[in-house]
Amino acid sequence: MASRLPTAWSCEPVTFEDVTLGFTPEEWGLLDLKQKSLYREVMLENYRNLVSVEHQLSKPDVVSQLEEAEDFWPVERGIPQDTIPEYPELQLDPKLDPLPAESPLMNIEVVEVLTLNQEVAGPRNAQIQALYAEDGSLSADAPSEQVQQQGKHPGDPEAARQRFRQFRYKDMTGPREALDQLRELCHQWLQPKARSKEQILELLVLEQFLGALPVKLRTWVESQHPENCQEVVALVEGVTWMSEEEVLPAGQPAEGTTCCLEVTAQQEEKQEDAAICPVTVLPEEPVTFQDVAVDFSREEWGLLGPTQRTEYRDVMLETFGHLVSVGWETTLENKELAPNSDIPEEEPAPSLKVQESSRDCALSSTLEDTLQGGVQEVQDTVLKQMESAQEKDLPQKKHFDNRESQANSGALDTNQVSLQKIDNPESQANSGALDTNQVLLHKIPPRKRLRKRDSQVKSMKHNSRVKIHQKSCERQKAKEGNGCRKTFSRSTKQITFIRIHKGSQVCRCSECGKIFRNPRYFSVHKKIHTGERPYVCQDCGKGFVQSSSLTQHQRVHSGERPFECQECGRTFNDRSAISQHLRTHTGAKPYKCQDCGKAFRQSSHLIRHQRTHTGERPYACNKCGKAFTQSSHLIGHQRTHNRTKRKKKQPTS
């Protein structure tokens, strides 16, 4: 019988006969004792299911006989021999023994039968448990009967283990019954026919070890469902903190050891409290802002543009919001800045340190000068993190404090702005302008405790570096998304942000001494010295160092020109070619000579022009040694040598 819940009421009533299974004398004789016992249990369970949806019914006599009889066969009660109730046209074989008389249960009509297991479904659903409790006949049964029914239904090993732990001698009628019930529970839990002696021993050691743990720790470990002792040890070692109150005194026996026949009421209350209270695991050491911050040296900071510095500020503030959102009480310290300087004197990069505090975390006015931004970014970032955390598992929302005196004036105090939990969500609209001198982030209750500090630190460090570049691209697209083709192309070619932090390794080429901060670029550069060209064109056999170069070259054979100018309609097969072409329409000359101030549209033109100032002539003729500033000039010069050779080879007339 499949267990399911009703989705809609049936049109026809279901009688007890619809859910009853009958046997002939020959069939009944073929059943062994266990099968007959199972038949009796199924019939009794069907009766309980009928009663659960028809509470006014009383217990019929046949049910009592089923509960008492050890070898009951339903055909021994005698009913009319020739017909089956409700099917008079069907005749019975006269050689068969008569069927039992019509039971009062045959007249029971219910809407739909719910096949529910009281022992399994009841403890997990209060409404299902109430169905069994409302019937007086069921609630009058002795507790020992319930334990016996649990023992007769094997269930899964975990359920048997729970029943084994909850076994009480006082629920049994005598020592013999208690011993038999305990042996049956052990068989259901340990399953000696399916497990070896070593596996059974492992289960017993695991159970004893769990019983020796403190109550709260044991409750948390059991919730992780460990399968062996090694997993339990790993879980316990991962717990880095536990209060002294939860540690058992020396010499005191562990509570809740396996199969305790006598458990006091006080110990039971402690076990119930341990099941309700969540396990709080705190890190061994506080996470400081320095652990998750990305630092720059003075030279590295000078390489960053204004947009990248702005993104650095946003990501650092967002990382700080992460620390606050998980309940850390932190204090933000700053360093004095030199006049008209974007970075501190002692430490070039904006270094933000978070240390443990008992109440607040403060951002001084010099932080604003350092990061070149307003407190509004701090507000937006912290609120965003709090709202995202609330959507997952936080019951409350954090807002800014709204003081009535400040709301009436339309602006906040110029000394400080408080970030607190408030009940009025309209305070943000009334808060007015924000001053950037100081921000106080008040204590936020802990919401989530970190089990492993190292994994959290690595995750926050990685997210900080990645989001710097992602947010830069998003802001660029948001500002210039509706611009011309040139703007869109420039946005898609956003230069990757140079992710540098203290201790990072710089790649230096041993052949030419060139330095690379991106390992991918360095690997491409090494192929130039080795001559490796792994990407070969299938049409002409030409090799390339990068796959993108091969893709661009294949457009020469296919004639594909996917890049079209929106101004004149001219098409190009290379993205850089259309970028250079767009400058003819806009008149942009981004490459400027530092010596004479002359500007150029292409970087190659600037490099060629700078040779006029430096006197460099990198292209030398291998015939006569003459040098040139451009490769095209060298090619033209080499033709003069070829003409001279051809003239010498011509015969004289």
UniProtKB/Swiss-Prot annotation:
Q: Which UniProt keywords apply?
A: Cytoplasm, DNA-binding, Metal-binding, Nucleus, Repeat, Repressor, Transcription, Transcription regulation, Zinc, Zinc-finger
Q: How does it assemble?
A: Interacts with SETDB1 and TRIM28/KAP1. Interacts with ATRX. Forms a complex with ATRX, SETDB1 and TRIM28.
The region annotated as signal peptide is none
Q: What is one cellular component GO term in this UniProt entry?
A: cytoplasm
Q: Which InterPro entries match?
A: KRAB, KRAB_dom_sf, SCAN_dom, SCAN_sf, Znf_C2H2_sf, Znf_C2H2_type
Compositional bias ranges of the Polar residues kind? 405-414
- Biased composition of type Basic and acidic residues is found at 389-404, 471-483
Q: What does this protein do?
A: Probable transcription repressor. Specifically binds to the 3'-end of zinc-finger coding genes and recruiting chromatin-modifying proteins such as SETDB1 and TRIM28/KAP1, leading to transcription repression. The SETDB1-TRIM28-ZNF274 complex may play a role in recruiting ATRX to the 3'-exons of zinc-finger coding genes with atypical chromatin signatures to establish or maintain/protect H3K9me3 at these transcriptionally active regions.
Q: What is this protein called?
A: Neurotrophin receptor-interacting factor homolog
Q: Which organism is it from?
A: Homo sapiens
Q: Where is this region: Disordered?
A: 139-159, 339-359, 388-414, 448-485, 632-653
Q: Does the keyword Cell membrane apply?
A: no
Ranges for the SCAN box domain?
A: 161-243
Q: Which gene encodes it?
A: ZNF274
Q: What domain of life is recorded for the organism?
A: Eukaryota
